[in-house]
Design a protein with these regions (language model features):
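Short, contiguous pre-domain boundary segments
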Residues: 5-9
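C-terminal substrate-binding/active-site "lid" region of AdoMet-derived donor-dependent transferases
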Residues: 197
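A polyanion-binding, active-site-adjacent surface
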Residues: 2, 14-163, 167-170, 175, ...
Length: 225
């Protein structure tokens, strides 16, 4: 499990020394040694590796990593570029981007371009056993990612949260910074996207907020590979 550095290490490094994290580390290590677990161990903290704390301008909160082969790589909603099947929730995100900003729908689900621009693509649980959704919930990741969210909440600059679905919206009480914008909608899953995710216009709203506050907006267009 590749650790954090830079501003992230300063902000949440103390978590690694807490008893809950020792238990979490032992659990995850045992899972990797006895089962297939996603993402690959070196990718667990990619959300923070790709998006330094002082560069975060948007946080999109997911739940579990994808649990099928060749999908998860440490960024919420994103899949590896070699994965040609775009997950249904991400297909719906692309549809909303197309309707909201006119973005072309790409042939891949690799969202690193967003992460490189300051979009923190964070899951609340950072590992999962293959083909067993939610299998690593309740073992400590939630405490750790709460510390990540708290570190973002403390940033003294404009930041946008996109919270889709009730689990993501359960974090709202933690988000107390008046300089930040909270956007909520149903989850983009096919089960709920038609209840208000489609038409939420979160991507244009985020960019308008960033521009109003002198922050470079996000180029949401993912290019074909």
């Amino acid at each position: 499990m590749s650790m954090l550095d830079g501003e992230w290490a300063k902000a949440v490094g103390a978590e690694f020394k807490k008893p809950y994290y020792r238990d979490l580390y032992n659990f995850v290590r045992d899972e990797y040694s006895t089962h297939v677990v996603y993402p690959p161990a070196d990718d667990i903290f990619n959300a923070m590796h790709f998006t330094p704390l002082d560069k975060v301008k948007v946080l999109i909160l997911g739940q579990d990593p994808y649990h099928n082969v060749n999908q998860a790589h440490g960024l919420s909603f994103s899949v590896l570029p070699s994965q040609k099947d775009i997950p249904p929730s991400l297909q719906n995100i692309y549809k909303e981007l197309h309707d909201d900003l006119g973005c072309d729908i790409p042939n891949n689900g690799y969202l690193k371009k967003w992460a490189d621009q300051g979009v923190l693509l964070l899951n609340t649980v950072l590992t999962v056993r293959a083909h067993q959704a939610n299998s690593h919930q309740g073992h400590g990741w939630e405490k750790f990612t709460d510390a990540i969210i708290e570190a973002v909440n403390e940033q003294d600059r404009p930041i946008v949260y996109m919270l889709w679905g009730r689990p993501a919206q359960s974090k709202i009480p933690m988000l107390t910074n008046p300089k930040h914008l909270i956007l909520t909608a149903p989850h983009p899953s096919p089960l709920s996207a038609y209840r208000g995710f489609f038409g939420c216009k979160h991507f244009s709203k985020a960019n308008e907020f960033l521009k109003e506050h002198g922050v470079e907006p996000v180029d949401w267009q993912i290019e074909d590979i």
